[in-house]
Design a protein with these regions (language model features):
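Short, well-ordered beta-to-alpha junction loops that form the rim of enzyme active sites
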Residues: 58-61, 138
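Active-site-adjacent betaalpha module
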Residues: 1-7, 43-51, 68-69, 76-215
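Short, solvent-exposed loop/turn and secondary-structure capping segments
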Residues: 20-21, 68
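Short glycine/proline- and charge-enriched loop/turn segments
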Residues: 22-29, 73-81
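A short alpha/beta connector and helix-capping loop motif
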Residues: 4, 22-48, 52-57
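Short acidic, Gly/Ser-rich segments with clustered Asp/Glu that frequently serve as metal-coordination loops
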Residues: 14-19
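N-terminal nucleotide-binding beta1-loop-alpha1 segment
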Residues: 9-13
Length: 215
């Protein structure tokens, strides 16, 4: 067992992105396999809690009128200007119920793809003495990959739970996983491949980091 202290980071698994009735699926921006990824992430959350590993949820949340959304995003994707979801305090912005996110859980709100940018995430992780991250969530090739890269550049070793992630298409998901793996930005693990002493396995069956061993 290595000496890393892990946290599980669940990125943006919110109703607005993942649930069929969420604001993004309603405008044709649904994610392939989203609810399956949520179900797998719920397993990961349960495993982490059982091992006393901190679980941190991020939410992509905007103020009323979305003044903090960003001009570049609206310019490149004007259809998003009409999306009224992801407002704080709404069902759309809430974490998917399957994840069991409670009011006293660790939740970091963000307004950019990178969960570290302009947020309290890094001080929170340092305060918890976290030295390595498991990451899962949506969208694989956008917020998940951006956050994984940012974590790597901050010297957090990253393990991506690939079967707990989803993207617009499975191909985009796979390409993102390949990029993170090929450039050694993250180890790739799987919750559904099985566990040995609480450790997720890679798709090949070779054990990766002991991310679910007791902290």
């Amino acid at each position: 067992m290595d000496s890393e202290r892990y946290a599980l980071l669940v990125v943006d698994m919110q109703n607005g992105f993942c649930h069929p009735e969420g604001s993004f699926p309603r405008i044709g921006r649904g994610l392939e396999g989203a609810m399956e990824a949520v179900a797998n992430a719920a397993v990961a959350v349960g495993q982490a809690r059982a091992a006393a590993i901190p679980v941190v949820f991020t939410r992509h949340v905007y103020r009323p009128g979305r003044p903090d959304e960003g001009a570049a995003l609206i310019r490149n994707s004007p259809e998003l200007a009409g999306v009224s979801g992801l407002a704080d305090g709404t069902w759309d912005a809430d974490a998917c119920a399957e994840l069991g996110c409670a009011p006293d859980d660790l939740v970091v709100d963000k307004v950019r793809f990178d969960a570290f940018q302009w947020t309290s995430l890094e001080p929170l992780l340092r305060g918890l003495d976290v030295t390595a991250l498991m990451i899962c969530g949506v969208v694989t090739n956008i917020c998940v990959e951006t956050t994984a890269r940012s974590a790597f550049m901050r010297d957090f070793p990253v393990t991506l739970l690939a079967d707990c992630c989803a993207a617009k298409t499975h191909r985009l998901h796979e390409l993102s996983v390949e990029v993170l793996s090929s450039y050694e930005l993250a180890e790739i693990a799987s919750v559904t491949a099985g566990f040995d002493a609480g450790r997720p396995q890679s798709a090949t069956g070779r054990l990766k980091s002991p991310v679910f061993a007791s902290a």
